[in-house]
């Protein structure tokens, strides 16, 4: 592109823009606009365990509380999350990816190399969530998650800082943690929302397909649903509190019977 000295001088002063420069700036602005709505977060989870006596080899069968953590200092997990949340538009799209690293990532059973508690290394990486988020302009807005997402039942979660206690209950130990499938959520009103979904299995293995053995069917899927009720602002100390009711029903592993979880 040929540019005379007069145009070049005006461009230097910022009074005009060169065609190529304007196009490049437009592309950069589009890129920064896309990145401005993307968030990166995470945490490092460490612990100190000390049990009196010599019973460290027979600890209660709670998740992430094995004998290898007793009487010492531990790195539990490192989490890295990248998310572009849905905006307020009627049609919206986003995504979320959460990766886990460290010993607790092995116990989550979604390691990238396929290793689990038997044969997995203590520095493994695992996928906690990885889904595409979509919104359709139906009523108040119907939101979808397609991919790997957290289960809809249970009071406790993997992220230790979000639990009321450091140790998790036996209920968390037997509950599903993650599913690979499609989940839809609809906000009925300010005080109530419902969710319904379908997944490959009861979880947690990513992309695993269920097989019920002798039952005659092309494929078997896991079904789930939940209802969330939020207390209104005039309920005093209970204002903003939420009660969840949910059920997950489906096959867990190959040739296994159905598993039903409610909360």
Regions found by a protein language model. Name each.
Residues 106, 205-207, 254-256:
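A generic structural signal for short coil/turn motifs at secondary-structure boundaries
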Residues 218-220, 225-263:
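Detector for outer-membrane/organellar transmembrane beta-barrel domains
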Residues 9-17:
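Bacterial N-terminal signal peptides
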Residues 209-216:
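Active-site cleft segment of glycoside hydrolase catalytic domains centered on the general acid/base Glu
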Residues 1-9:
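Bacterial N-terminal signal peptides that target proteins for export
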Residues 26-204, 219-221, 228-237:
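Outer membrane beta-barrel
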Residues 18-24:
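Sec/Tat signal peptide C-region and signal peptidase I cleavage site
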């Amino acid at each position: 592109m040929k540019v005379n000295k007069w145009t070049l001088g005006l461009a230097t002063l910022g009074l005009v823009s060169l065609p190529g420069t304007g196009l490049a700036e437009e592309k950069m602005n589009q890129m920064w606009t896309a990145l401005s709505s993307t968030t990166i977060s995470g945490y490092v989870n460490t612990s100190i365990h000390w049990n009196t006596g010599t019973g460290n080899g027979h600890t209660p069968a709670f998740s992430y509380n094995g004998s290898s953590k007793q009487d010492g200092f531990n790195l539990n997990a490192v989490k890295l999350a990248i998310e572009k949340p849905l905006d307020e538009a009627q049609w919206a799209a986003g995504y979320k990816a959460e990766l886990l690293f460290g010993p607790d990532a092995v116990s989550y059973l979604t390691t990238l190399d396929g290793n689990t508690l038997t044969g997995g290394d203590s520095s493994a990486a695992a996928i906690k969530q990885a889904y595409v988020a979509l919104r359709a302009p139906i009523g108040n807005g119907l939101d979808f998650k397609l991919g790997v997402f957290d289960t809809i039942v249970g009071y406790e979660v993997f992220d230790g800082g979000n639990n009321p206690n450091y140790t998790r209950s036996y209920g968390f130990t037997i509950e599903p943690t993650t599913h690979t499938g499609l989940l839809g959520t609809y906000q009925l009103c300010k005080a109530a929302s419902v969710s319904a979904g379908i997944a490959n299995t009861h979880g947690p293995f990513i992309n695993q397909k269920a097989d019920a053995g002798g039952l005659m069917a092309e494929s078997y899927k896991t079904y789930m649903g939940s209802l969330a009720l939020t207390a209104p602002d005039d309920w005093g100390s209970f204002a903003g509190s939420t009660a969840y009711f949910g059920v997950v029903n489906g096959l867990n592993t190959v040739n296994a019977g159905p598993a039903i979880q409610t909360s």
